[in-house]
Amino acid sequence: IGSGSGAAGACIVRDRLAPDCRIVGVQSSAAPAAYLSWRAGQIETAPCLTRHSGLATGRGFELPQSVIVAGLADFIIVDDAEISDAARVFAHLAHTLSEGAGAAALAGLLKATSHPDRVAVICTGGNASADEIADLARG
């Protein structure tokens, strides 16, 4: 989660089409403002030190937070290295080029200690920078 608009949209669609579906947010520990806002139930600020630009927010966003505060079943915090590892998994095993923000959901799944029978991971970003692509090529 960066601003939270994607997660909020997923919650709105879920409420209409599949109310039993659980949505779990994932955010970088190096930019935890959305997580802190969700946990507190109010807008929070936090240092933004992540190298994954799509997740780089230093303050929770009011409109998405108003939806995800009740809409998310859980929230997983991952570090930037776990996000980069997930981007490599996408590239090498799924043949999908993802920026770090797009790989965050997979990083959360890989970190989770338990999984339900069926899981969907949404890869939300394919805007990898030249540096990210070079890192993926190095493996």
Predicted segment positions?
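FAD-binding core of FAD-dependent oxidoreductases
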Residues: 6-7, 55
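Short Gly/Thr/Asp-enriched flexible loops that form oxyanion-binding sites at enzyme active sites
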Residues: 7-17
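Short, acidic Gly/Pro/Ser/Thr-rich loop/turn segments
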Residues: 8, 31-33, 62, 127-130
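Phosphate- and divalent-cation-binding pockets in alpha/beta enzyme and binding domains
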Residues: 9, 33, 85-86, 107-108, ...
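A glycine-rich, Thr/Ser-enriched phosphate-binding loop motif common to dinucleotide/cofactor-binding enzymes
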Residues: 99-103
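Phosphate-binding loop/pocket of nucleotide- and phosphate-handling active sites
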Residues: 104-139
